[in-house]
Amino acid sequence: MERGNQTEVGNFLLLGFAEDSDMQLLLHGLFLSMYLVTIIGNLLIILTISSDSHLHTPMYFFLSNLSFADICFTSTTVPKMLVNIQTQSKMITFAGCLTQIFFFIAFGCLDNLLLTMTAYDRFVAICYPLHYTVIMNPRLCGLLVLGSWCISVMGSLLETLTILRLSFCTNMEIPHFFCDPSEVLKLACSDTFINNIVMYFVTIVLGVFPLCGILFSYSQIFSSVLRVSARGQHKAFSTCGSHLSVVSLFYGTGLGVYLSSAVTPPSRTSLAASVMYTMVTPMLNPFIYSLRNKDMKGSLGRLLLRATSLKEGTIAKLS
């Protein structure tokens, strides 16, 4: 088999979805709508939290960072896919593919860590309510988020740099709509043992460990909640319900993607699972957090009311 290194190859082909032009047009409209809803929804969450001083608490600080990470995570893959569908092109350069891999891993890991920080915040609030303001002080929250960013970037950089040492075969077709790291490794002609070790290491440290932290936090929360009154239980579960829904959606779809790709060759099923993971989950997060949260709904309503009043005032002045 002919061999070539990454500088000689230059381009990958993202096979993506259906070849039928009518189906491509339908998918373009669907994915563009989902992307816009994701961006607008998460931006509204960020603006709502930043504009309301009552929401300047650790929980909403982590939530605003999570919304920003979701915007970046979706923007890593979806715009390129939309451009490829629009232009009927499947090509992505090697540099573009590496860039996509780097940001995909970085923001995916950041999502993991921020979900863990939010679970820890709920754990402290419910299990140690009298010490909550002392433990979850602004300095600690800032350090936790900064540390999450640094760890995510370093883990992503480590995994991305190991791909640079690989040589690739002449078959440069990726059976996906973005540069999935595991699919890129399958195209390599050179030994990928080190790459697989690094990938498993990053997955365990930045995926499995955070999930274990979330499970531990909620085991402690449930243990504490069972000892309080029914009213206290309802309040605790309503507080944690949104976060649990997001965690279940994020890890459930993520696990579905990699189990389906590991058990069977890439198919429409695995592509659908990837769409759930990369697009549907970030799109639904703002709805889950806002619809189940009275404070968020109230603040969002006031924000939209101020925006409407400002618009009407501007129109009145111009007329």
UniProtKB/Swiss-Prot annotation:
It is a multi-pass membrane protein. The keyword Methyltransferase does not apply. Residues 47-54, 121-139, 218-236, 292-319 are cytoplasmic. PROSITE patterns: G_PROTEIN_RECEP_F1_1 (PS00237), G_PROTEIN_RECEP_F1_2 (PS50262). One of its GO terms (molecular function) is G protein-coupled receptor activity. Residues 1-25, 76-99, 161-197, 258-270 are extracellular. Its main location: membrane. InterPro entries: GPCR_Rhodpsn (IPR000276), GPCR_Rhodpsn_7TM (IPR017452), Olfact_rcpt (IPR000725). This is Olfactory receptor 7C2. It comes from Homo sapiens (Human).
